[in-house]
């Protein structure tokens, strides 16, 4: 089985970002993702366009764009432009916008769950139609269909994504906390079971929040379990946490593939060296 890893990061300066893009491609990462948090992150399509200029094969995507505060035509225009200048490497990652601080940053009150879900579906479907040629004459994307990545855990949206998305990104994030940015963790394997079932066979990618190459995986899982308020046994099973020697990490990847069919992962920048070494050693391959 081939497992793939994507890198989730954002720039701190130009030279570092361009270097990261080059190194991620050379190491065999499947995609370079960047977040969208209006008011507290860089502009996703600007930094992805910069990465496109210094790479040739790595996919480039938003992870994930807040669909609640953007018009479909502007989303379609940005992603079509990225696909054009990257030679067909764009991925459109969309979410419903569950973080209150993002809505506050644009001077709007976050709607309730039902309204956000309704609006997300409307925006996502309109954007896909435009990318297919309905209402967006120029630019035209290189790909016949720009892959749509849905990021979220809402039950209704997972059912929708099962029939409309090309990839479902599970982050393990739960309720938004009082600061408007941080979230509770929903890392329980039982929750993953339910979400994967809702995905209905659409490929799933897990966002790994904790990653460590170590000879003492038990100690790492014990520490992380406290952070996530789950048991050590659950920490050792959940796809959002990975610890161990290269062979132990490979065994966990295989275990997650057997249980959930998950073979794609996104990791944050601190995991770069460990994942790059894993890719170089050959137990996993870019797919």
Residue positions per predicted region:
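Active-site-adjacent structural elements that line small-molecule/cofactor binding pockets in enzymes
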Residues: 1-287
């Amino acid at each position: 089985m081939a497992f793939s890893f994507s890198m989730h990061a954002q720039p701190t300066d130009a030279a570092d970002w361009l270097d990261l893009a080059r190194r991620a491609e050379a190491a065999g990462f499947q995609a370079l993702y960047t977040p969208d948090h209006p008011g507290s992150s860089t502009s996703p399509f600007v930094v992805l366009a910069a990465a496109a200029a210094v790479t040739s094969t790595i996919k480039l995507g938003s992870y994930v764009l807040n669909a609640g505060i953007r018009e479909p035509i502007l989303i379609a225009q940005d992603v079509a432009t990225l696909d054009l200048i990257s030679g067909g490497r764009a991925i459109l990652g969309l979410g419903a916008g569950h973080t209150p601080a993002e809505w506050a940053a644009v001077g709007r009150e976050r709607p309730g769950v039902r309204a956000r879900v309704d609006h997300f579906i409307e925006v996502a479907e309109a954007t896909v139609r435009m990318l297919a040629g309905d209402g967006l004459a120029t630019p035209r994307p290189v790909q016949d269909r720009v892959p749509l990545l849905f990021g979220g855990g809402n039950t209704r949206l997972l059912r929708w994504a099962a029939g409309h998305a090309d990839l479902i990104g599970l982050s393990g994030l739960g309720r938004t906390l009082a600061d408007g940015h941080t979230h509770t963790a929903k890392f329980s394997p039982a929750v993953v079971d339910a979400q994967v079932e809702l995905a209905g066979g659409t490929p799933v990618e897990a966002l790994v929040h904790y990653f460590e190459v170590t000879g003492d995986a038990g100690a790492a899982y014990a520490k992380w379990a406290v952070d996530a308020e789950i048991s050590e046994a659950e920490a050792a099973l959940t796809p959002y946490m990975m610890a161990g020697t290269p062979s132990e990490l490979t065994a966990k990847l295989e275990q997650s593939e057997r249980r959930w069919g998950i073979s794609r992962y996104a990791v944050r920048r601190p995991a770069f060296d460990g994942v790059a070494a894993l890719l170089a050693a050959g137990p996993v391959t870019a797919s």
